[in-house]
Amino acid sequence: MTGSGLKSLDTTQLPATSRGMFASSSRLVVCLVNEGLMQATYLPDVSLAPMDGLGSVALLTLQDLSIVVSLAHTPQIDEQGAILFLDRLDLQYPIFVGTMLTASELPAQLTECNCPSALMRLVAARMDNFDEMLLKQLCAELDSSVEHMSNLFLHPHPEPTLNSTAIEWEQSIIEGQGTHPMHKSRYAVAPVCRVKPDTNTSKLTLTLVSMPADAVVVSGEFLTIMAKLLPADMVPIGRVPILVHPFQVPNVVSMFPEATIHPFTVLALAQSSLRTVIIPELPNYAFKLPVGIRVTSAMRTISPWTTFMGPRMIPILDRIIPKSKVLKYAAEHSSVSAKNSNFDTARHLACVIRDDFSATLREQNEAVIVSAALTECPNGDVARVIKICNLNSQASRVEFLSIFVDLALKAFLVPLIEHGFSFEAHQQNTLVRLTIPQPGDNSPVYPSGFIVRDFGGVRVHQETLFKSTGMRVPVLPGNPNEVTDLKEAYTRLYHSLIQMHLHRLIRALDLHYSGKGWLIVRTKLEHYLKPGDIGHELWLSSETCKWKCFIRMKMKELYKDYLYRDVPNILLYKGEGRELIHQGGEASL
């Protein structure tokens, strides 16, 4: 059965708090299934209430706990009806819980439960040795996500257009990351004060501190750029000026007694990542600042690995990026970091300055839009990419995706194939360039290229890079960026580009359930990945792929190391009703 005949509510008509809860709880349910934390069964002909018709549901079980949610679409299942992979857009509001339910017992006595932290507590109570303090923290992060998500539903930023600035597009993001239950978390870690839902995180007042020159590591043109911003003689000779995010001041005061706070502030506009800001007086730069707040998986600080590698990687990026206009990179040419052998301390006082092309490209009639903003559906139906790019027919959506995929593979897959270098090309790190049409021109708008930013998450196979360029990426010991097995770099790009980027775009263009979107991607990939290649083996030949386990990683308190589980390879998806049948796997590092 395709879809569900069960009566469902349009979540856009719900109160903001209910919408915020379901945004996080639906992601949590998906994690419970895809990470193998609960067994999930597809039931095709079920009624959950007397007034409902028959439809399909997902039944999740763990010991005596049952979670039941109706389905808008058929997920990927095996011959016995076990659900192998689920997406939040497969789910319909609301979520129910019950005790010791089986397929034959539905409909049964069910209790509605859309609160993600309540669901997490029910699940954790049935797991062995689940640490109580860890559970408390995890639930607090879920609650934070709901609070901030609900507030954004109540007070969204104005809807952007192709004529909007890049920062307006950054700040227009509502739901953000498509699969992480803590997608909108703003969980402050003491001594940082709680970030209230109504706190203005878009417009910030930065604090200026200085450190003794021998207490920091400075790279690139950091001091020259800071001199453009500060009054002369603001900072004494022998000290280095550093801008600090307003939320981070308590950490700096408590961790760095040698820091001096100066009577000077700077107004800034925050990008979608919260910690990266644009200063209007220096529009061609973006300043990435640490902040002791957990957003999704980890605290948003900046490690010495990142501040060291960024400026030193520029000559390599100049060599490996395809010689075309397809991809520009936001060079991290300048940085500063506290000098401390304990990186857990040093990462709290740092700054990375990178190029920002948006103002320059706008003068050349190009809109620069963070990719995550394009796939948002503010009104719950049509994605922004369809509206602002005038993709009013399936043919135009197919053409948009075809061009997008072709450009993306040239930009991100070619450096991996030729040089063993994997960008972290997910939606927040990738900016889409679109030519702004003339007034009155309603023809479809197609992408012309990308900008990639944020290199702290890149993966590089140094031996492959050295063979192709004669260079190696300079790194500090213990860094997470080097991989000894080239397969790890392919797994990294698969996660960021295929699962976290193209998957969301294909769904936004309504080309997923038909299978047409994935047919386009496979066809394009076959041009680059040939039988016998590592990439072909991992991406096009294997029925399974690695899925990043967000909840399992939180349970093990991992942020630098990843935990994966085998799930169906989305690249081989043929369409609803034609799902691949195979077995999943156990989680492993």
Language-model features, listed with the residues they occupy:
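Nucleotide/phosphate-binding site architecture used for ATP/NTP-dependent chemistry
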Residues: 1-407, 435-589
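Conserved kinase catalytic-core segment
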Residues: 393-432
